[in-house]
Amino acid sequence: MLETLKTLNVETHLIMSEWGQKCITMETEHTIDYVKSLATTTSDEKNMAASVSSGTHKIDGMIIAPCSMKTLSAIANGYDDTLVARSAGVTIKEDRKLILMVRETPLSAIHLENMLKLSRLGVIILPPVTAFYTHPKTIDDIVNHGVGKCLDQFDIDHDLYPRWGNSQNT
């Protein structure tokens, strides 16, 4: 996501939770420093005074990727104990776009109720599920589909996956 946004010259503000950092080291070949270098600005998740914790800080929206069920629950219940949860709460109260890339499976009734609660507030629940009509060949193809779906929500042009209806898939 950050690589694509940097290429497109989109300003980004990165908040990485402790578990987000663990995901990066366990699931990718990237270093934390490399990921931080992709963002315009970074903030520590414990810094509740960061600019993004205030509604006066103008942003187009927020993407939480990946979004754990713990973070989903915190946001759904207004428990702003981290900068991620606080910033998400601010994004909701300021009526800005919030996208949660949840990836837990299977989902419990509690998870679904929290998602429904947030969806009713206008939060976009966008699990990184690929569309197989795109005929993904690599993990990057699958990742790019999820990234592209997020960018679509912000009307950011990209060519990360083939659109339905082009000559490749009709």
What are these regions (language model features)?
Residues M1-I99, T105-T170:
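A cross-family phosphate/adenosyl-ligand binding-site feature
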